[in-house]
Amino acid sequence: WRADWFDAVSDVNALAHCLHGLRAALGEKLLLVTFRTQAEGGEKPLAQEEYAAFCTTVCASGCADLLDIEFFPNRKALPALIAQAHAAGIAVVCSSHDFEKTPPKEELVRRMTAMQQAGADLPKLAVMPRSRADVLELLAATAEMTDLHPETPVITMSMGALGGVSRL
């Protein structure tokens, strides 16, 4: 659920009420909760303190199965946010989005490894290709990460029409 599209996301009671409604409607289906900040391609900005409060509300609700925590805006707070989610029994997707380019393979692997070392259950990268070679760069990084850390599943995607093959 993309909470950045929820108008009352900053209202703790409204957010908790909405999460309980989603949990009831979904039954046994998994609920992934995401607040995608504007800096990472989302609907609205959210200060770091507000983002942490959002994560706390999600964790306290007992409704989420997975929580997506953004990597770069929260890098210093990441281990604490992940520990909070894990203490609540919530798996963590740690995400990074680059809408301008595809960084080199080594940087992509470094990012995913840093996410894993911070405690993320599922590192996630979404990057923008400028060429077919960029798509292959992401796929090579994905292969290297899964070879180095087979215990950690990863989510990677190359965006746009050019990256479609990476999203099969």
What are these regions (language model features)?
Residues 1-87, 93-104:
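Active-site beta->alpha loop and helix N-cap motifs at the rims of alpha/beta catalytic domains
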Residues 66, 71-168:
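Catalytic alpha/beta core domains of metabolic enzymes, predominantly
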